[in-house]
Curated annotation (Swiss-Prot):
It holds the Pfam family DUF525. Gene3D superfamilies: ApaG domain. SUPFAM superfamilies: ApaG-like. Coiled coil: none annotated. This is Protein ApaG. Residues 2-126 form the ApaG domain. GO terms for biological process: error-free translesion synthesis. PANTHER family: F-BOX ONLY PROTEIN 3, POLYMERASE DELTA-INTERACTING PROTEIN 2.
Amino acid sequence: MSALDNSIRVEVKTEYIEQQSSPEDEKYLFSYTITIINLGEQAAKLETRHWIITDANGKTSEVQGAGVVGETPTIPPNTAYQYTSGTVLDTPFGIMYGTYGMVSESGEHFNAIIKPFRLATPGLLH
């Protein structure tokens, strides 16, 4: 664990995209807007992403790759980077979590933790 691991805060907002979902075909589309906030003293570049996505049936998929939405943004200190992406589940509920592989201005590699967040159709959870 690096001292820089806590220098990045990740906030998530999710939305169920009803008009592009097809529950009768077990296809539920969710968008998620991620805000990555650099609380550290150095710029940090997002190099990789690693997601674990689990639906209500326990089916898990893993997504790994370079950057996010085709970008590898450098986030200066005390600023934020935001993007929106999406995923399709076979169930009306699921959970996502993961990490961003980051590198600091000084060349130190560290992980920014993405805490588990829910993907759920409206009215499903009280």
